[in-house]
Every structure is written in C-alpha cells, then in structure tokens.
Amino acid sequence: MNIPKDPVMLVSFLNLKLRDQYASLNALCDDLELNPEEITQKTASIDYHYKPEYNQFL
C-alpha cells in the first residue's frame, strides 16, 4: 500500500487508521504489509512515538 512519505502526513494517516480500523500498530502493519520499525523511525524523526495505551502516535 502507498502511504504518505511526509512524516507529518504519515502520523495523520496512521492515527486515522488506528482510531477507525486497527486495535494496534502491529495489526495495522500486518494488514498493510508495513515494517513497524521503519514506521516508528519515520514518526520519531518529528518526535511522535506510538503509545499503545492510546493506540495513537503522540
């Protein structure tokens, strides 16, 4: 799946998917065939980190 390359847009995309469709980052990555380590590196570049207790990047 094509996902946004811009980190800000990526966080918005991920949080929307996590809120509406997926119970966890791993479920999202498994379904969309994404590497969770790559995702978290990209979001960390703008100081957003996955918080499992909220199921969001904050």
Task: Pin down the residues of each PLM region.
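Short alpha-helical "recognition helix" segments of helix-turn-helix
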Residues: 28-29
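Short acidic, Pro/Gly- and aromatic-enriched capping/linker segments at domain boundaries
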Residues: 35-48
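N-terminal acidic leader/helix
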Residues: 1-20, 24
